Amino acid sequence: ACGGGGGGDSAPGVQPGPPPPGQPIPPEPIPPVPSANPYVEAQVLNAFITAATLNDINQPVIEFQLSDGNNIAITDLTLDDVRFVVSKLESSPLGNLTGTWQSYINVIAPPGVGPGTVPELQGTSERDGTFTNLGGGKYSYRYSTSLTDLPADILQQAKAQGLDLSCDPNLTHRVAIQF
């Protein structure tokens, strides 16, 4: 026996059960309105390079999409928010599991920068190509660097250091985006 007294769902600390059948269904929650500044506010960025090609003058052209941690498209990315890199994987005489990444985009670091006492080629990034917002969190970027027409001073410095900056389409290449 329960001891009487009814109690039901009116006793202190007792939560009511589900509504009886046939009651109205509560409305769906209203999703939050996407932010006007999703890039600045995103705590997680999901970036996917969806295409990478060379145009007729051997400039890399990439397409990519960007979303936040909730898979909401980042629609306000600007060229000031990103930098781009392109490099090739050069083989090594030590075997097929070794090699070095050689950047096509370089500057010459003068003596005294870092531990060096002579000018040194230093890989860098660019952002002076053509950046296009395609809408819906999709973007494209055409590098200003042509892989087959690098600046003469960079090629001369590379030669002095024993580096090969020639474009070999048979090698593995990598494009990267820095946010």
Which residues make up each language-model segment?
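Extended surface/linker regions that mediate inter-domain or inter-protein docking
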Residues: D56-F179
